[in-house]
């Protein structure tokens, strides 16, 4: 009876998919975007340049479709790091980084454009790229899935 019941337990991959994910940021160069997977979903981690940060902070967020200031999308004192879902909020495609008119992401499926803060600026997507829970563990490591 026990072998049958134990087969109902989730496999190691399923269990691991729900656990927090540690990411070492040290090798990520300024201006580089990396993709990781957490809970089976792609996540963008963007090491933003000073130009990208300034552009995101000075944009008129109140006039955007899904208004949100850059300060609500990054951690205080760590504005160079943006961590968002890599899934377009229109129909679920994966946008391409550093493309489009806003130095952010461009979704080739239907033309949605996001800025360097992951906010929707143009196209059919209704919402900003979703934020994911994460916290810093020191200066060069984040833990996705914890706050």
Model-derived segments and their meaning:
Residues 1-41:
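C-terminal segment of N-terminal export signals and the immediately downstream linker at the start
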Residues 24, 49-50, 71-72:
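Alpha-helix initiation/capping motif
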Residues 54-147:
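Rieske [2Fe-2S] iron-sulfur-binding domain
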Residues 37-52:
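Short, surface-exposed binding/anchoring microloops in extracellular/periplasmic proteins
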Residues 20-24, 47, 107, 137:
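A sequence-level detector of short, solvent-exposed, charge-rich linear segments
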């Amino acid at each position: 009876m026990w072998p049958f019941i134990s087969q109902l337990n989730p496999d190691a991959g399923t269990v691991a998919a729900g656990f927090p994910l540690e990411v070492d940021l040290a090798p990520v160069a300024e201006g580089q975007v990396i993709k990781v997977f957490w809970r089976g979903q792609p996540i963008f981690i963007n090491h933003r340049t000073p130009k990208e940060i300034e552009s995101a902070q000075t944009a008129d967020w109140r006039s955007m479709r899904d208004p949100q200031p850059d300060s609500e999308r990054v951690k205080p004192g760590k504005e160079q790091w943006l961590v968002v879902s890599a899934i377009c909020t229109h129909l679920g495609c994966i946008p391409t980084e550093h493309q489009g008119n806003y130095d952010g992401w461009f979704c080739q499926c239907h033309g949605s454009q996001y800025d360097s803060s992951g906010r929707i600026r143009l196209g059919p997507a209704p919402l900003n790229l979703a934020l994911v829970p994460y916290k810093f563990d020191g200066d060069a490591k984040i833990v996705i899935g914890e706050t």
